[in-house]
Amino acid sequence: MSDKTLSAWNTVKTDRFLVGVPHYPEHVDESYWERDAERMAKAGFNVVRMAEFAWHILEPKLGTYDFDLFDRAISILGRHGIDTIMCTPTATPPRWLTAAHPEILRVDGKGRPMSHGSRQHCDTASPVFREHSKRITWAMAEHYRDNPFVVGWQTDNELNTSMPESFSQATLSEFQAFLADKYREISKLNAAWGGDFWATAYDSFEQVVLPIEFGPTFPSPGHLQDYHRFLAFSTARFQHDQVEILRDVKPSWFVFHNLGGLRDIDFRGQFSKDLDFVGYDIYPMLYDEFMRLGNHAKVQALHLDICRGFSGNYIVPEQQSGFGSQPGFCTLTPEPGELRRMALSSVAHGADGLMFFRWRPAHFGAEIYWMGIIDHDDIGRHRYEEATRFATEMTALKDKILGTYVRMDVGIAGSDFDNQEAHKTYPIGLPSPQDDAILLHQYCYDRGIACGFIHPEDDLSKLKLFYVPHWVMWKDEWTARLEAFAASGGTVVIGARTGTRTQDNHVIRETAPGTALSRLTGVRVEDFGRLAAPGANGLFDVMERSGGLVIPPNKPAESHRRQRRFKIGNREMTAGHFYENLTIDPDVEVIAAWSNRYAEGQPMATSRKVGKGQVVYLGTYLTPELTEALTERLFAPAGVEPLVGGLPEGVEVTMRMNDERRLLFVQNYMDQAVTVDGVPAGRDLLDGEKMVVGRLELEGYGCAIVEVEG
């Protein structure tokens, strides 16, 4: 494993701002290639990405390699000044491989093997598949080692996006080996998984089964946690096989992966440390359809800020350019001006390179209506013009943009694999830590406050406030880091339930939130309970159990009536999701108290001075109303202020900076013109360095990058 330091403040180290497209020369007649290269060069593109789904072309039968198609395509592009990023094609193994080795196919939770085709149909835990993956990677690396136009590599494609889990025999065998290596003795595994509950103990590692849910009832949370740890380990190992080969063949190549669904990947482990930087594929209008936040600009900012928390700045290997679809879903079509605005938003949130998906749409297959820069009729319209404008701007501004990090005044604890998985193993209808954090992120986004995600092991010194959203798994060394941050003047906010489970996913045996956190916060949890979500009829909408899902009647339960209310400042509001009854130390200030039922007058939220700062504890989950009240109380004393005050609706503001410069990105994500007041003095780098003093006029989907004076 690399000793690379992972930090949200890292920048991408490349010799240019990479700008271009994923390109599929195998999808179009060769008579188009020269014209394609000419138009890419005219657009200002300097790189393409190729071959991630082309294993069947590169190796049409076992041991017989044919690189001719890609050699010719790379050569034509190179003559026009366009370099190539090659991809290991292991997301789509060829049919001859699965026909010869059907045991490498993934198996779902019902025991059904995946059919050949589509993508990610093979099991990355399979030793047989791993050997073939290494073989094709080595063959490609050796072939392209001396090609001057091949500058870097992408591993696989969106690992674990289609189907992260597998219940194959290969996965079972590898899982058993993983556990034997971790625990050494079966008695230690039984203790970690709570084998004395429901007769789940094992006599040997060979007896261990995969955690198929509802077989007939729920598996142990410890069992589930280790299974997903194994999946993350297996994914990182599969990628490491490839990275090791690429590094050995040509150390000067950069290597990255294009993240998609973010499932079963430990971003603070070997997976990210093996890479020069991460890539993240961003389809704002698609992700908004999944999340239904009602605003694709907010969704884009959220996803990119989460990604940046893994290891810092990134590149975008696939940026939505047009209408996107597969047979079962589709997206909105970006209006004229939106392609460039979305691309600039990616840069504003940390992209140090960007490729528009894709050069031209396919005329066949399961993505025929996933549009690209060029249309089906081979004509480049407004998307080509906008991509050209963006490429020209990034080439001109690369020395300003590269080397800057994204400012973050409010940090949200993120990028911790164990905590997201621990929630999934025992959710009891509660929002995940990330879902809870979305409320704070959206609040900051709407008000132009610099906000992002960062791990407590990272450098917190640039922050002013740090929020921990209900991380049930906690390490005492993190407590020491939070204490040091507060002592130096920072504000720490810790959500309910934090620190209540061990690394084995057991409930702790001390009074919550655990000895170290209790000392830091001055708080002890005496009792707790679930509450209905705001507006809900009960504690859950769907009950999962053996035999399927049970949907309760659409009528109020007792939990709908049994509300917990609290007062904070001069406001009174209803708590959502969860409550805790707290006792406190003498040096702790109560900043919110329960105001009804038996807990009336008892602390709900507290603050304890630590050095120059404070540590706040919340005995509930965030709601929109609580988020507003809490930030009004905490932000100003912490020194948290908007980058631009009084933002009109539809305007996004972010800042990239370093010791030499500050770049304020101001974007209008609405289709109507808007006036933004309160902009700090500087020069708009997208408008001929025009001087900006206080006021900025933006057309619909208009953007500015203001290099702030002083």
What are these regions (language model features)?
Residues 205-208, 252, 272, 283-286, ...:
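Carbohydrate-binding surfaces of carbohydrate-active enzymes
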Residues 15-17, 44-46, 78-84, 146-151, ...:
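Short, well-ordered coil/turn segments that N-cap beta-strands
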Residues 28-42, 135, 139, 260-271, ...:
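Short, acidic/polar
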Residues 18-30, 53-68, 115-134, 159-163, ...:
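The substrate-binding groove and active-site-proximal loops of carbohydrate-active enzymes
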Residues 35-42, 49-114, 141, 242-249, ...:
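Aromatic-lined substrate-binding rim segments of carbohydrate-active enzymes
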